[in-house]
Amino acid sequence: MPKAKTHSGASKRFRKTGTGKIVRQKANRRHLLEHKATKRTRRLDGRTVVAPNDVKRVTKMLNG
């Protein structure tokens, strides 16, 4: 059976940490930021851990 390929879209969006958690960027911080509150854009800054319900699916796409 051939090796499973990594989902290229998922590999660009998700990273695995040293402890095994899967992290992602938060949405809504790419463009049209002019009308969004500074407080909101600060909150959307940085990375966050993937929801527990999605971990299995994302791991499968990353062949982990």
Curated annotation (Swiss-Prot):
Residues 1-20 are annotated as: Disordered. The keyword Ribonucleoprotein applies. One of its GO terms (cellular component) is cytosolic large ribosomal subunit. GO terms for biological process: translation. It comes from the Bacteria. GO terms for molecular function: structural constituent of ribosome. Keywords: Ribonucleoprotein, Ribosomal protein. The keyword Ribonucleoprotein applies. InterPro entries: Ribosomal_bL35 (IPR001706), Ribosomal_bL35-like (IPR021137), Ribosomal_bL35_CS (IPR018265), Ribosomal_bL35_sf (IPR037229). SUPFAM superfamilies: L35p-like. Belongs to the bacterial ribosomal protein bL35 family. PANTHER family: 54S RIBOSOMAL PROTEIN BL35M (PTHR33343), LARGE RIBOSOMAL SUBUNIT PROTEIN BL35M (PTHR33343:SF1). This is Large ribosomal subunit protein bL35. The lineage of its organism: Bacteria, Bacillati, Actinomycetota, Actinomycetes, Mycobacteriales. The gene is rpmI.
